[in-house]
């Protein structure tokens, strides 16, 4: 389907506000996305009509809240190409999902000298948990390098995968370069060496069709807030048998079957990984976000991202005096464009754009090793979503021109 951006924008109340008297042009969607009124309405409806704790009551409100919570789990599984709902674990965010794998799967299994293969474009959320684990276990971290064109150096994959490799953890779509990595190829290579594969899908699940069974990974992590949902809700997906072989990550209520003074037994999966009271309202309302994206169609969401990214790359290149990072073609990347004007610091540019109502991100984007690879301290980053249109890209380009005028710099 063709996107009617103006119609979509009407579903997002925040897009009606002005920033410094200007229309809000929100281009920071890789950090978080705005929420449609369907989500906000469901959030209010939950508290107004069924607010109760789940899985631990037999009264009507508790049963209704539990049913809606578990319905959201089934919708997540369906959204991911028919994953098994028993393998869908709700966490606080993608970061916690990755830490869960590091501590509940990897830590008991890794020994000194075992290897974990990462890449040079990982978000800190898929670096720091493994740095901590390496300190705890004596495991060795290895890294698949990033080529100058923004793609991974897959020619090095077979050399870096060894008999000592226990896990490969790879970002699906870079939050800096936009690069979409061939995770199926990487997962298959890992499996041939007897290793498991974790896919950080925080920047892919919101923007393209993602089928957990088809990707071939053993674990998949993402966050709800990057796809029209709430903060405080993340997802870890795995096969139920993989989760069953793992001990819990956190202990407390909800994740137990029986507790005695000196011992305990665990609940079935996925609940043995959901200790304590979760963000019930957020999970319930997240189903509305998934319904909204399903109605739009993820193929259409992806096509819109490619079209808008291509337009942005063309317009920014025509502007001149900008360095653009990542693959040259829009088809190889998500809706993320990072760039620098070597005469204006990215933080200054972001500040001046904000005065024009334009929200971008400036900094290292929680990817400092990648910044070192690019030999820059930071970049400016524009990232798009379903409510962005070519007029937003035009506003960004004009905003950069205005920033150059502010500094009395020539601009084509």
Predicted regions: what is each one?
Residues 1-412:
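Pyridoxal 5′-phosphate
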């Amino acid at each position: 389907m063709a996107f009617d951006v103006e119609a979509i924008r009407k579903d997002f109340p925040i897009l009606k506000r002005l920033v410094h008297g200007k229309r809000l042009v929100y281009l920071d969607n890789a950090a978080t996305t705005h929420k449609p009124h369907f989500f906000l309405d469901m959030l209010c409806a939950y508290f107004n009509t069924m607010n109760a704790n789940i899985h631990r009551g037999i009264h009507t409100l508790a049963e209704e809240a539990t049913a809606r919570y578990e319905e959201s789990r089934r919708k997540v599984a369906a959204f991911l190409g028919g994953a098994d709902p028993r393998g869908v674990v709700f966490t606080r965010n993608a970061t916690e999902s990755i830490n869960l794998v590091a501590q509940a799967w990897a830590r008991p299994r890794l020994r000194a000298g075992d290897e974990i293969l990462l890449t040079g474009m990982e978000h800190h959320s898929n670096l720091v948990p493994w740095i901590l684990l390496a300190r705890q276990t004596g495991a060795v971290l290895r890294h698949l390098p990033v080529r100058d064109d923004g793609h991974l150096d897959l020619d090095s994959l077979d050399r870096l995968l060894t008999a000592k490799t226990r896990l490969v953890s790879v970002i699906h779509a870079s939050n800096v370069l936009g690069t979409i990595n061939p995770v199926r190829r990487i997962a298959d290579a890992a499996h041939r060496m007897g290793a498991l594969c974790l896919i950080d899908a925080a920047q892919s699940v919101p923007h393209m069709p993602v089928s957990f069974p088809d990707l071939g990974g053993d674990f998949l992590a993402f966050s709800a807030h990057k796809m029209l949902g709430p903060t405080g809700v993340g997802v870890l997906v795995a096969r139920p048998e993989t989760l069953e072989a793992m001990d819990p990550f956190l202990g407390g209520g909800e994740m137990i079957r029986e507790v005695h003074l000196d011992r305990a037994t665990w609940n079935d999966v996925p609940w043995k990984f959901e200790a304590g009271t979760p963000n019930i309202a957020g999970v319930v309302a997240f189903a509305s976000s998934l319904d909204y994206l399903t109605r739009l169609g993820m193929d259409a969401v992806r096509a819109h991202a490619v079209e808008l990214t291509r337009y942005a790359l063309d317009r920014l290149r025509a502007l001149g005096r900008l360095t653009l990072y990542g693959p040259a073609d829009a088809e190889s990347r998500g809706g993320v464009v990072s760039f620098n004007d070597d005469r204006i610091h990215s933080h200054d540019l972001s500040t001046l754009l904000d005065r024009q109502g334009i929200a971008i991100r400036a900094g290292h984007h929680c990817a400092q090793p990648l910044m070192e690879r690019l030999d820059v301290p930071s970049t400016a980053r524009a990232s798009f979503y379903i409510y962005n249109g070519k007029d937003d890209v035009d506003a960004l380009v004009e905003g950069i021109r205005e920033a150059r005028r502010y500094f009395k710099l020539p601009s084509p």
